[in-house]
Amino acid sequence: MADQLTDDQIAEFKEAFSLFDKDGDGCITTKELGTVMRSLGQNPTEAELQDMINEVDADGNGTIDFPEFLNLMARKMKDTDSEEELKEAFRVFDKDQNGFISAAELRHVMTNLGEKLTDEEVEEMIREADVDGDGQINYDEFVKVMMAK
């Protein structure tokens, strides 16, 4: 399934994988998965985290390595309920629930994920997505960016 991904997608997933793989050992544990999910405002139980890992843990060793992670991401991209997932993701970024993602909100979420971005980098991310030029990202703009990945 991962063989349908472009080089760009694989590179992007490698970056995401390293955000999860806090200790850099090449595997994502339930603890690391939990840390990242909580930084995104989710609150999964230990059992839910284990289920998520078991879902993609092909070799049954209790952790997710990069090839397993790629398969998970390829599956997620094919999921038809991605509309709901996009809304959920948008809500994570849109802290004040005003229907827009501001530079401050974007910076906040990226910082929680351990990505220290300069003001310039945050502004650049907003500019790339901001079709109507109002300085923030609305839901339609967010969907365009997420679907273009």
UniProtKB/Swiss-Prot annotation:
Ca(2+) 3 binds at D94, D96, N98, E105. Ca(2+) 4 binds at D130, D132, D134, Q136, E141. It comes from the Eukaryota. Pfam families: EF-hand_7. Residues 8-43, 44-79, 81-116, 117-149 form the EF-hand domain. SMART domains: EFh. Ca(2+) 2 binds at D57, D59, N61, T63, E68. Keywords: Acetylation, Calcium, Metal-binding, Methylation, Repeat. Ca(2+) 1 binds at D21, D23, D25, C27, E32. The keyword Acetylation applies. InterPro entries: CALM/Myosin/TropC-like (IPR050230), EF-hand-dom_pair (IPR011992), EF_Hand_1_Ca_BS (IPR018247), EF_hand_dom (IPR002048). The modification N-acetylalanine is found at A2. Calmodulin mediates the control of a large number of enzymes, ion channels and other proteins by Ca(2+). Among the enzymes to be stimulated by the calmodulin-Ca(2+) complex are a number of protein kinases and phosphatases. Belongs to the calmodulin family. PANTHER family: CALMODULIN, MYOSIN LIGHT CHAIN 1, 3. This is Calmodulin-3. It comes from Oryza sativa subsp. japonica (Rice).
